[in-house]
UniProtKB/Swiss-Prot annotation:
Keywords, comma-separated and alphabetical: Amidation, Disulfide bond, G-protein coupled acetylcholine receptor impairing toxin, G-protein coupled receptor impairing toxin, Ion channel impairing toxin, Neurotoxin, Secreted, Signal, Toxin, Voltage-gated sodium channel impairing toxin
Residue span(s) of domain LCN-type CS-alpha/beta: 21-82
Modified residues (Serine amide): S83
Transmembrane intervals: none
The protein's name in its UniProt record: Alpha-mammal toxin Ts3
Cystines in this chain: C31-C81, C35-C57, C43-C64, C47-C66
Domain note: Has the structural arrangement of an alpha-helix connected to antiparallel beta-sheets by disulfide bonds (CS-alpha/beta).
Keyword Disulfide bond annotated: yes
UniProt KW Signal keyword: yes
């Protein structure tokens, strides 16, 4: 009986929650967004448009990096960027 109550409480606490992740957002072709001139404002706006909490230009790779992206938003994988192909 105690386990049943615990299970109900856990289900109620997790119902409706959406996971968040950090990473490099990508376009349809697995290409990350480039931030020329190290433009943090551009990356922050891009990330927030994708429902992330915030973002910045990661200067080592010159790519936008987002914090708190929804799980449904694709991020950079190990696959190659297929620029120009749909």
């Amino acid at each position: 009986m105690n386990y049943f109550i615990l299970l109900v409480v856990v289900c109620l606490l997790t119902a409706g929650t959406e996971g968040k992740k950090d990473g490099y957002p990508v376009e349809y072709d697995n290409c990350a967004y480039i931030c020329w001139n190290y433009d943090n404002a551009y990356c922050d706006k891009l990330c927030k448009d994708k429902k992330a909490d915030s973002g910045y230009c990661y200067w080592v790779h010159i790519l936008c990096y987002c914090y708190g992206l929804p799980d449904s938003e694709p991020t950079k994988t190990n696959g190659k960027c297929k620029s120009g192909k749909k």
